[in-house]
UniProtKB/Swiss-Prot annotation:
Free-text note on domains in this protein's UniProt record: The first C2 domain mediates Ca(2+)-dependent phospholipid binding.
Signal sequence extent: none
Residues reported in the UniProt entry to bind Ca(2+) 4: 460, 466, 520, 522
Quaternary structure (record): Homodimer; disulfide-linked via the cysteine motif. Can also form heterodimers with SYT6, SYT9 and SYT10.
GO BP: any one term: positive regulation of vesicle fusion
Low complexity: compositionally biased ranges: 183-205
Organism listed in the record: Rattus norvegicus (Rat)
Domain C2: 297-418, 429-563
Gene Ontology CC terms, in alphabetical order: exocytic vesicle; plasma membrane; postsynapse; presynapse; synaptic membrane; transport vesicle membrane
UniProt cross-references to PROSITE patterns, sorted A to Z: C2
Cofactor(s) in the UniProt record: Ca(2+)
Official protein name in the record: Synaptotagmin-3
Gene name as annotated: Syt3
Protein family per UniProt: Belongs to the synaptotagmin family.
Keywords: Calcium, Cell membrane, Cytoplasmic vesicle, Differentiation, Disulfide bond, Membrane, Metal-binding, Methylation, Repeat, Transmembrane, Transmembrane helix
């Protein structure tokens, strides 16, 4: 109330001052009164503006409420009314016929959309002219009144209706046969006489009634028609029935009756062909009669060779591969190819990975620097692998090619084809790491300079990796400190030239060592270790112990070595008898 009272008092004061200013005609006071007029115009009256704001707000709130109400009604209609309508439609004749009808229900079951029973048995079916009539003749007249005088035996038969014969009782089948209607498959009818080429005719099986049909049966007339001409049915092993006698309770088993022209076909039926039961292995190879030894072909590879005499370059173009075996559970492989120019295995090239295919097309070109005089002693080695993101890559097969000079002189438009031979398990090639060690005894500093890595394992689907190097200072199986390099994107031969410095006292240098891991960086998920190498006085690798001893023998001097990367589980421990780092610790 105090706020409203003060506002009202201020408004009255402004009105009073404005009236006084309006009555005073003096020029001196006119300027002073001008500011009161402006103040009144800005602050008073505010009633219409407030009313407009409230009206606009109410309109917005009302509109939003109407929109929300409409959305809620639409969602309710979609969630509640539509499913109930569909459920009701399927129950009232729009859905399939039920098989749980009582034995008294006739062939009609549920007709139209009303869902009313037209007869308690087949004898009262309207199609057969029985005495039963619909409960509402005004709306649904009997089908007997809609038929032409010719009945079922006329020249214009009714459209065939597809019904489920599995639910018919034995009495219903008998009445069907008595009325002159016979069941048949949905395929065209067989003529009653056994013609040539009909193959084999079987008597109906014992047990009475008709054989169970896996699909919907067709009720057609026995009278010949022109609308549905009879076509010869292809030879099958199903039982063909010519007539059904409901009075017989026991029948002999079905026996083959050879017909004219069908003796040879009858002999072929039922014979076992052993060649069809031999297993087919990956790539279409028979596994039943083969020995399965190494060297079996597992696909083919196409490539082209060319030697450049001016630059001493051997150009290799990998074109495609065909009929590779499936290595994954989905029936495909993720193949890629590595090539070496033997006996040098340090320099290698690798194609891109092709996902989910057994016939990859590569079309990639690589060059090897090799003098012409050495080309006769060199061999080209192709290794086809299946890429696996979370485990070791599977070796599909390999091709070793000699006589390179002779093959390189062939026309370039004639590609070479070779069978990919299945080889034994090959040692995992994870790459190599080049780094130097330098120890300063006076300062107590151990400097590890990571220079470069080569031929790293591809960890990404692009055929590359995002590697970085992590060095850990280890003492008695525990990690004391760790240092990391920068990440090099999309490469298998990164160059770092980065120094990692550790504080190591002179009295402790004989009790520590280094674990150096090359890790593939992933933006999503965990980083994966490509390979590790370890150096120190108690390292399991002799090369790692030699490198450490050479560093101690040459203080203040960097000692550089290449180290082969190995898997973490291959090198079970850091020391010869102690506990090493786990793979999880290496990837951190």
């Amino acid at each position: 109330m105090s706020g409203d009272y003060e506002d009202d008092l201020c408004r009255r004061a402004l009105i009073l001052v404005s009236d006084l200013c309006a009555r005073i005609r003096d020029a001196d006071t006119n300027d002073r009164c001008q500011e009161f007029n402006e103040l009144r115009i800005r602050g008073y009256p505010r009633g219409p503006d407030a009313d407009i704001s409230v009206s606009l707000l109410s309109v917005i709130v009302t509109f939003c409420g109407i929109v929300l109400l409409g959305v809620s009604l639409f969602v309710s209609w979609k969630l509640c009314w539509v499913p109930w309508r569909d459920k009701g439609g399927s129950a009232v004749g729009g859905g399939p016929l039920r098989k749980d009808l009582a034995p008294g229900v006739g062939l009609a079951g549920l007709v139209g959309g009303g869902g009313h029973h037209l007869g308690a048995s087949l004898g009262g079916h309207p199609l057969l002219g029985g005495p039963h009539h619909h409960a509402h003749p005004a709306h649904h007249p009997p089908f007997a009144e809609l038929l032409e005088p010719g009945g079922l035996g006329g020249s214009e038969p009714p459209e065939p209706s597809y019904l489920d014969m599995d639910s018919y009782p034995e009495a219903a089948v008998a009445s069907v046969v008595a009325a002159g209607v016979k069941p048949s498959q949905t395929s065209p009818e067989l003529p009653s006489e056994g013609g040539t080429g009909s193959g084999l005719l079987l008597l109906p099986p014992s047990g009475g009634g008709l054989p169970s049909a896996q699909s919907h049966q067709q009720v057609t007339s026995l009278a010949p028609t022109t609308r549905y001409p009879a076509l010869p049915r292809p030879l099958t092993q199903q039982t063909l029935t010519t007539q059904a006698d409901p009075s017989s309770e026991e029948r002999p088993p079905a026996l083959p009756l050879p017909l004219p022209g069908g003796e040879e076909k009858a002999k072929l039926i039922g014979q076992i062909k052993p060649e069809l039961y031999q297993g087919t292995g990956p790539g279409g190879r028979r596994t039943g009669g083969g020995s399965g030894e190494a060297g079996a072909p597992c696909g083919r590879i196409s490539f082209a060779l060319r030697y450049l005499y001016g630059s001493d370059q051997l150009v290799v173009r990998i074109l495609q591969a065909l009929d590779l075996p499936a290595k994954d559970s989905n029936g495909f492989s993720d193949p890629y190819v590595k090539i070496y120019l033997l006996p040098d295995r340090k320099k290698k090239f690798q194609t891109k990975v092709h996902r989910k295919t057994l016939n990859p097309i590569f079309n990639e070109t690589f060059q090897f620097s090799v003098p012409l005089a050495e080309l006769a002693q060199r061999k080209l080695h192709f290794s086809v692998y299946d890429f696996d993101r979370f485990s070791r890559h599977d070796l599909i097969g390999q091709v070793v090619l000699d006589n390179l000079l002779e093959l390189a002189e062939q026309p370039p438009d004639r590609p070479l084809w070779r069978d990919i031979l299945e080889g034994g398990s090959e040692k995992a090639d994870l790459g190599e790491l080049n780094f130097s060690l330098c120890y300063l005894p006076t300062a107590g500093l151990l400097t590890v300079t990571i220079i470069k890595a080569s031929n790293l394992k591809a960890m990404d689907l692009t055929g590359f990796s995002d590697p970085y190097v992590k060095a850990s200072l280890i003492s008695e199986g525990r990690r004391l400190k760790k240092r990391k390099t920068s990440i090099k994107k999309n490469t298998l031969n990164p160059t770092y030239n980065e120094a990692l410095v550790f504080d190591v006292a002179p009295e402790s240098v004989e009790n520590v060592g280094l674990s150096i891991a090359v890790v593939d960086y992933d933006c999503i998920g965990h980083n994966e270790v490509i390979g590790v190498c370890r150096v120190g006085p108690e390292a399991a690798d002799p090369h790692g112990r030699e490198h450490w001893a050479e560093m101690l023998a040459n203080p203040r001097k960097p000692v550089e070595h290449w180290h082969q990367l190995v898997e973490e589980k291959t090198l079970s421990s850091f020391t010869k008898g102690g506990k090493g780092l786990s793979e999880k610790e290496n990837s951190e």
